[in-house]
């Protein structure tokens, strides 16, 4: 069977020696397969490779058939989100981090010679990960890369001081909340910040988003799962200095003022992730969350 993906990009986490070594190993393996390889600019600079083709993430998205991201979930999150803004390029994650919820291929010879080989031949399963976008007071001037989230959009207190929110869903009043903040999460993000705040785990293929209160000053506040077709309007009603901040996937903090409106809805773009043919999301949950471990 011929390869389905011929022009392959490699993206790694910068300044990590073990990632750079894996990038070099991966490059050599792909060369042996006769594939065309392009390495992301900063990733290439961290290696000892010479005379290699390099490109920016935008160029990779527009020129390559597939991108392999080497690193942890954070690096995968950042790279795949940015790649998806420019094209529908599929992404493969090789884990050189800690948990590996998103980077599902192991960083070893067996994974390269069997799992990665099969995926590049087209023998794979696909997950389409939805993303969220936001705007503040209907202002559309924020850079695209700073307004799209793969995991979550969070509005949080700057120094642990409570503030007030009023939430509308599809134009209808939903609830008021005072507390440390609110997380609006995709299914992908439901195993990240949202889970730490007590939210439910959503299957990545589920067409939902979840609103998770952060330390609400009420015993009645609970996570709320809604359709990902809904439009969420969040008003900042009051706060104690300093102002609350909005972040996407833990980055790009935006300071919010009283009476400002944050509108959140599903983004048009999705991240396409390739897995092995026998990939089972529940295996990942069981392994990473220790569901099968005996505690005593």
UniProtKB/Swiss-Prot annotation:
It catalyses: NAD(+) + ATP = ADP + NADP(+) + H(+). Gene3D superfamilies: Probable inorganic polyphosphate/atp-NAD kinase, domain 1, Probable inorganic polyphosphate/atp-NAD kinase, domain 2. GO terms for molecular function: ATP binding; metal ion binding; NAD binding; NAD+ kinase activity. Its cofactor is a divalent metal cation. Pfam families: NAD_kinase, NAD_kinase_C. Its EC number is 2.7.1.23. InterPro entries: ATP-NAD_kinase_N, ATP-NAD_kinase_PpnK-typ_C, NAD/diacylglycerol_kinase_sf, NADK. One of its GO terms (cellular component) is cytoplasm. The active site is at 73 (proton acceptor). Keywords: ATP-binding, Cytoplasm, Kinase, NAD, NADP, Nucleotide-binding, Transferase. Involved in the regulation of the intracellular balance of NAD and NADP, and is a key enzyme in the biosynthesis of NADP. Catalyzes specifically the phosphorylation on 2'-hydroxyl of the adenosine moiety of NAD to yield NADP. Belongs to the NAD kinase family. This is NAD kinase.
